[in-house]
Amino acid sequence: EPTPRSFNGDKVFRV
């Protein structure tokens, strides 16, 4: 399940 994480002010979905 991909978890939404904030990176550099952008939301990136990583598994």
Swiss-Prot record:
UniProt keyword Secreted, yes or no: yes
Record's subcellular location: Secreted
Residue stretch(es) of the prosequence: 1-15
Note on cofactor: Binds 1 zinc ion per subunit.
Descriptive protein name: Carboxypeptidase B
Taxonomic lineage: Eukaryota, Metazoa, Chordata, Craniata, Vertebrata
Keywords annotated in UniProt: Carboxypeptidase, Hydrolase, Metalloprotease, Protease, Secreted, Zinc, Zymogen
MF annotations from Gene Ontology: metallocarboxypeptidase activity
First-level EC class: hydrolase
EC number, as in UniProt: 3.4.17.2
Cofactor needs: Zn(2+)
Entry's Gene Ontology cellular component terms: extracellular region
GO biological process, one term: proteolysis
Family per record: Belongs to the peptidase M14 family.
TM helices/strands, residue ranges: none
